[in-house]
């Protein structure tokens, strides 16, 4: 199975200030990318192939609980039909990242808006 991790424009804009604040974040995100390639459905399921991942920010020194949250949307495509039908190509879209100390939880409305925004811009 081929897994691609894709950064959305929204994720990129939310990431910018965090990169300035936390010098370890690039390395932490590389670890996350590796983990997502191994397990695209990493984190807590929020329904409809959307997941919330607790990300440790090493330079914060607070572990996963005080780190960042990453919202992902997983898309799978079947390439070719064989006897065993399974997704052959998976894309993990990084929709949002936020510092847990700045934002407690993402609301259902914010989540729906994120997905709607992604679906509008990805077509």
Predicted regions and their residues:
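Arg/Lys-rich, positively charged N-terminal/basic patches that mediate binding to nucleic acids
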Residues: 1-29, 123
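A structure-centric signal for secondary-structure junctions around beta-strands
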Residues: 2, 47, 65-68, 89-91
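Non-catalytic, surface-exposed connector residues within folded enzymatic/regulatory domains
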Residues: 5, 23-26, 47, 65, ...
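Generic solvent-exposed, charged/amphipathic alpha-helical segments
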Residues: 12, 16, 30-34, 111-116
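A generic structural signal for short beta-strands and their flanking turns/coil linkers
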Residues: 32, 49-51, 68
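A short, surface-exposed loop/turn module that caps and links secondary-structure elements
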Residues: 37-64
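Enriched for short, Lys/Arg-rich terminal
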Residues: 68, 73-123
């Amino acid at each position: 199975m081929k897994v691609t991790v894709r950064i959305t424009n929204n994720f990129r804009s939310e990431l910018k200030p965090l990169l300035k604040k936390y010098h370890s974040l690039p390395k932490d995100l590389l670890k996350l990318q590796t983990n997502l390639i191994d397990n695209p459905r990493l984190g807590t399921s929020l329904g409809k192939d959307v997941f919330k991942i607790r990300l440790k920010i090493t330079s914060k020194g607070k572990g996963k609980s005080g780190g960042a949250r990453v919202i992902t949307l997983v898309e799978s495509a079947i390439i070719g039909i064989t006897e065993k039908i399974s997704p052959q190509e998976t894309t993990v879209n990084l929709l949002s990242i936020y510092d847990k100390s700045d934002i407690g939880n993402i609301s259902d409305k914010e989540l729906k808006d994120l997905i709607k925004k992604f679906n509008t811009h990805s077509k």
